[in-house]
Amino acid sequence: GLHKLKIKCPMPIKNKKGSYLFKIKKKQACIVTFLDGKDKSELTAKDCYVVGKNIGKLHKASKKLKIFRKNSMSINSWGPLLNKIDNRINKVSKNLKNSMKHDLNDIKQKWPKNLPKGIIHGDLFIDNIFFYKRKFLGYIDFYFSCNDFLAYELAICINALCFKKTNSSFIFDKKKSTNLIRGYESVRKLNGNEKKYFNVLCRGSALRYLLTRAYDYLNTPKNAIIKIKDPKEYIKKLNFHRQVKSYNNYIN
């Protein structure tokens, strides 16, 4: 797997029966090695370069793996998910349901068809990136890992890592975004089409997380152990991507 290809991540371990995958209480499970370090509360621009570089390494190394998994949260899943979100979501933001519907239709029309694909992590939020003594240590939580557009991974990271929260606003940090892309391109260059469609990939990623957060907001029991994440964060991020049109808006 990835660990043998020198990608910094936990390594799967076989159980006593020699299987990597098995079931616990009818759910799929696996055992992995422990990864030292922990996540940071906020990444610096320098950290973003290192993260980008290691995403590039992941994408390059994963070409050698002959495994395939469809993205269960790809653009084709967003419509059915939107249909499950009822009008109560408009309490979060006025006319939100219609706004998401409009965004989805527009993004679907503009969504690319032939960008370079490969294995992506698919959920690289700050709590899945580990550091030890300020040094990058590796990635965890490959639950959403799948085959998809490689540039879509960067779009997810732009949304997850390159906005600064100030009060109730989320301000785009172009320095972090630039470093993330530069770090990535130190290993793998983006081609012209990936740059051309970069904005729509960022919009799509923001909508995907807005949809899942909106659904969870309405359907997670109030006494659930998991913390419900605020959909408003991704309303604001989606607004930013609507206002910009070009790859140059993401890089200095």
Walk through the language-model features, giving the residues of each.
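ATP-binding pocket architecture of kinase catalytic cores
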Residues: 1-67
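Structured catalytic core of nucleotide-sugar glycosyltransferases
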Residues: 5, 9-13, 19-22, 30, ...
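Active-site acidic catalytic loop and adjacent metal/ATP-binding pocket
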Residues: 12, 105-152
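A glycine-centered beta->alpha junction motif in the catalytic cores
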Residues: 29-42, 83-87, 207-224
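A cross-family kinase active-site recognition segment
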Residues: 42-95, 117, 225
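Active-site activation/catalytic loop segments of kinase-like enzymes and analogous catalytic loops
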Residues: 151-189, 204-221
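All-alpha amphipathic helical-bundle segments outside canonical DNA-binding/catalytic cores
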Residues: 192-202
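ATP/Mg2+ or Mg2+-diphosphate-binding catalytic cores
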Residues: 209-252
